[in-house]
Amino acid sequence: EHCLNPSCMAACPSGAIYKRAEDGIVLVDQDRCRGWRQCITGCPYKKVYFNHKTGKAEKCTFCYPRLEAGIPTVCAETCVGRMRYIGIFLYDADRVTEAASVPDEKDLYEAQLSLMLDPHDPRVIEQARANGIPDAWVTAAQNSPVYKLAKEWKVALPLHPEYRTMPMVWYVPPLSPIVDLLKDQGHDAESSQNLFGAIEALRIPVEYLAELFTAGDTEVVTFVLKRLAAMRAYMRDITLGGEGNEEIANSVGMTGAQMYEMYRLMAIAKYNERYVIPRAHMEDAHNLEEMGCSLSVDGGPGMYGDAFNDMEGRPTPVSTSVYENSNKVSLFSWDGNSRPDGLFPNTTGKK
């Protein structure tokens, strides 16, 4: 989850888990890890696992070498449903402990949102520049799809905020069970009034989602589902050749333009709209993690040495320059047997 307040980092006796200052990614230092396994029990999301071959703890690295090159993570790149988005937040790191310490668990969601700074605010931009954040990162924050979904439109929610780890992977709750139920009962499943009534009447799905995303606060989940239902009804009128009903948008505190923008991002967004990833700046190259992909170490899930004998098990440097000089290959069109240029590192010095 790459939390703002990671419990695995606090639980590690060796101090092997750290949060990168440049992008907030939580990583495990394999040299310092001594296999205490306290991070495994300390992570409430069970995102840390123990590699019995190496005797080290491992976790999702968020494909940081790819991010440094401005390329999405592998899980996002290969998602057939195009359900994943990647963007950045500008947040107030000094207030993380304060936000995670609010007494009422139901206030944790709003407390976490309060940490997210408005990238369009001139004061935030000025302070970001003073702190050495490149303008390209500020621009990326302004165009971040995750910021729009989580903070601007408030339709994405954090997973189990009651753990007080301030997770930074956000989820849009599903509307489909309610739509399917209305359709099975013979009702108009696209009508905003029918959807609003069903959301309030079906307490079990709402309460279940509230336990997942809002520490049991059903009002927040109801608000999110109503916004999604309103977008569905608003766009149906436009699709059928009519004009968007502004009353539907206004009923959930949005405008027609915002409703259409949200629809576009969630339904037909292009590649560069779903993944807004600023590249690492070369002037900060000394801070980059110039090493092999963490999934391709001995004993790792990539099993680098066993999979590619001609590589002799040597880690391949994954950096901005490597991606710049390589060709893009579509995994969907790859036959799985050939070795097209750009898919594997060039170890012979020849194309």
What is each of the regions a protein language model found here?
Residues 350-351:
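Short acidic DE-rich linear segments
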Residues 5-32, 37-55, 68-95, 146:
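Iron-sulfur cluster-binding cysteine motifs and their immediate structural context
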Residues 81-347:
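Long, compositionally biased charged/polar accessory segments in the mid-to-C-terminal portions
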Residues 58-61:
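Membrane-embedded catalytic interface detector for glycan/lipid assembly enzymes
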Residues 49, 66, 102-106:
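A short linear boundary/processing microfeature
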Residues 1-2, 65:
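The substrate-binding groove and active-site-proximal loops of carbohydrate-active enzymes
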